[in-house]
Structures are given as C-alpha cells and as structure tokens.
C-alpha cells in the first residue's frame, strides 16, 4: 500500500465517538454548575474524538428546567443531548431520588435507540442509578465504560441520615448500584486517591485508573479576578478569611462563625490590655479579621441568625459567579475549607480555586489524604473540625504572621499550577480513554 492510499484511508476512518454522561454541568450561558465534564468534552474533541455530552433537562443548581431550544446549547464543539428529568427542589429527598430514577430510565431508552453509536461511555458517579445504566449498557454491547467518581453514595448520605437498620434499608439500592458499577467498569477516574481506589473493594480484578482533581481553568480564574477586582473594596488594615461554597450539612460554617466571634473578643482584649500597659508596640500587630462567606444554601438563614447572636464579624455575600468569586478569593488573606467531622468528602471542588488565589488555607476536613497533602505541600494548616477555639488559634496565628501567609500562599499557587489546572491535568483522562478504545 502506498503512502497516499494509507493516508486517504486514515482520513476516511471515522473518529471514535464517546458518550460523556453527567447530570450536573454548567452549559451555554448558565452561571451555576460544574465545568469538569464540559472542559473534558472540549478536550476530547481537540484530541480527535467526537463527543455527545449527555445531561439532564433539569439544571441542578437553579432547580429549574432548561429551555433546551436555546441557541447557547447549539453549535458547540461537542453535541449536547438532553435527557428528560422531572426535577426536584432539595438536594437530598425522595423527590430527587425519583427524579434520578426517571432520568436513568430515559437514558437507557436513549442508548437503545442509538445502539452502536459509541466507542466508549464515560459517566460520573453519583447518581448511582444513572451510572449503572451506563455500565450495564456498555457491558452488554462490549464497549469500555469508565466511571468518574466524584462522591461516595451512600456513604455521604449517612452523614445526614444515619438511623440504625432504617438507613441500611433505605440506602441499600444505592450500595447495590454502586457495587454493580464498580464491578463492571473498564477504568476509573477519581477526584481523590480515596475515590479512585474505591472500586477495588467490590472487585478482584485490577483496572486502569487515574486521580484527577476537579480543579479549575486557571487562566479563567485569573482573568475573572482581574475583571472583578475593582468591585471588591477592602478597608485598609483589615484581614479577610473567606469561605466559598455551599451552606449545607457537610460544611461547618457554624464553627467558623463562632471562631470569628471568639477571635474578635481576643483581639479587643489584647488591644485594651496592651494600650493600658503602654506596650502595644512591643507585640506583633493583631489586625481585625473579618469572615466573608460566599455562597448560598439551605442553612443560610440559621447561620445568619447565629452570626447575629454571636456578634461575629461575618458577612454573607450570597452566590457569586466564578469571576466575582475569584476576585474575592484573590483579595482575601486566608481561605477556609470548613467541613464537619462526619463529612466523607476528600478533595472538594473549591480546593482548586482556593489554591489558585495564592492565599494560605485552613482545613478542618478529616480526610487523611487531604490533611496529608496540606502538610506535605505546605500550603496551609489543618485544624480539628468543630472546635471553635482551635480554629480561632490558627486564624490568629496566620493573621499575625504575614510572612507565613506569603510562604503558604505561594506554595498553594504552585500546587494549583502543577496539579489543578484542568487544561493540563485532564490530559490524564484523555490518555486513559484513548488507551481503552
């Protein structure tokens, strides 16, 4: 065969088509949602694949149906396919479970109508029943299936509802679906080493795998911070500790509020004591620390009431789009990853943005993997969860030691550039999929 004929045949060979399945993604002109699967779809197309990004008609963050006829969902590098889903109003209730069940059923019907279309299926888990449809269909049609494990259900659910016997019965379907997915998968991508290793508990055969943090688009973060920096006004001499994310069951904002109140009382007492003794200049400066809470969620009203009761220097700024959030984080002095003791989350979505800010991080999460990373990489300090006094101690140490903040912040930014920038880190996913097709 001559070179010209070989080249012509190679050019005529159809590009492998991958189904990327996610029930939660920010698309088009939407302002809320995760970008992981959108960015991955774009990169797969750039790397020589055709992609159907299959997602829900229901926008999880807005809790509303999408207008799927909008032009912003068309003309993209990948093909967007919407699966009908009735929707729900809360993140954890029976309505959401039923909604995902309907979506899984409709996804199965869609796969059956398009049999032979895909060379590989890639989906997130959870939702477990949606992932099970993907895994079983791929197995039946002898094509690879790869799970993107970004949370553990039902383990995470037990943190909210843990009633002996009753919880076991209620969560049995989730455990059953997860086990089936883990047994059938051809490969796994986890957003932490813990998640990547989870399928091994339910199978004996090894599987190709990669740990790829959720991360962020570092260039977009920096651009958003530049564009919105003028909107953030910071009084001279004031330090900010910032939390960005959901105000819900997993995230321990109550302890952060109590710690802020305690720290302000300490500062006031210190100022009065040193002023009376005439020794203020002999001590390290003790600047006021204000806590800025970016985000929204079901616990917001309760937390606002707690802040008022504690007379805590805390401001609730509500939901911010990514550019505004980047500006607030860049203007901060300390970032706080505040989780309850029972939280099973490992390396959560916000970590990439915290590190990108170039500011030190306080971590109250209990994940051994992430606590070790905080210490080993040197970008922050770990604190025992649900301990206001311990959190106030660390806030004070960072507030009164500018050099430590600078060193830790620089280390965090370096980690963001090396491990959390989606445009480079996601190449590991692309390569894993390429090797399976």
Q: What residues fall within each predicted segment?
A:
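Nucleotide-sugar-dependent
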Residues: 251, 321-328, 335-355, 362-372
């Amino acid at each position: 065969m001559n070179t010209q004929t070989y080249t012509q045949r190679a050019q005529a060979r159809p590009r492998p088509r991958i189904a990327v399945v996610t029930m939660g993604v920010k698309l088009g002109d939407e302002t809320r949602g995760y970008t992981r699967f959108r960015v991955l779809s774009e990169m797969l197309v750039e790397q020589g694949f055709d992609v159907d990004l299959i997602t829900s008609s229901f926008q999880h963050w807005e809790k509303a149906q999408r207008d799927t006829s909008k032009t912003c969902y068309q003309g993209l590098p990948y093909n967007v396919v919407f699966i009908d889903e009735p929707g729900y109003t809360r993140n954890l209730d029976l309505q959401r479970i039923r909604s995902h069940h309907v979506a899984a059923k409709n996804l199965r019907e869609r796969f059956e109508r398009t049999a032979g279309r895909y060379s590989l299926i890639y989906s997130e888990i959870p939702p477990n029943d949606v992932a099970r449809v993907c895994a079983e269909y791929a197995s039946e049609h002898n094509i690879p299936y790869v799970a993107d494990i970004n949370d553990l259900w039902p383990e995470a659910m037990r943190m909210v509802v843990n009633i002996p016997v009753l919880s076991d019965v209620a969560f049995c379907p989730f455990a059953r679906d997860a086990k089936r997915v883990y047994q059938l998968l051809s490969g796994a991508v986890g957003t932490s080493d813990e998640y990547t290793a989870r399928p091994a508990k339910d199978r004996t055969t090894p599987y190709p795998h990669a740990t790829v943090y959720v991360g962020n688009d570092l260039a977009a973060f920096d651009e958003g911070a530049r564009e919105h920096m003028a909107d953030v006004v910071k009084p001279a001499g004031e330090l900010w500790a910032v939390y960005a994310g959901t105000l819900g069951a997993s995230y321990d904002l109550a302890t952060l509020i109590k710690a802020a109140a305690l720290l302000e009382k300490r500062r006031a007492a210190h100022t009065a004591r040193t002023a009376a003794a005439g020794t203020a200049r002999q001590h390290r400066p003790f600047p006021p620390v204000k806590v800025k809470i970016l985000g929204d969620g079901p616990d917001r009203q309760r937390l606002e009431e707690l802040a008022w009761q504690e007379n805590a220097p805390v401001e609730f700024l509500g939901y911010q789009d990514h550019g505004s959030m980047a500006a607030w984080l860049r203007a901060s002095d300390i970032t706080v990853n505040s989780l309850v003791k029972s939280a099973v989350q490992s390396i959560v979505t916000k970590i990439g943005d915290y590190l990108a800010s170039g500011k030190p991080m306080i971590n109250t999460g209990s994940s051994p993997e992430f606590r070790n990373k905080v210490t080993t990489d040197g970008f922050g300090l770990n604190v025992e969860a649900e301990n206001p006094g311990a959190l106030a101690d660390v806030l004070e140490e960072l507030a009164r030691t500018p050099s430590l903040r600078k060193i830790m912040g620089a280390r965090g930014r370096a980690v963001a550039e090396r491990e959390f920038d989606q445009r480079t880190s996601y190449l590991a996913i692309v390569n894993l999929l390429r090797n399976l097709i």
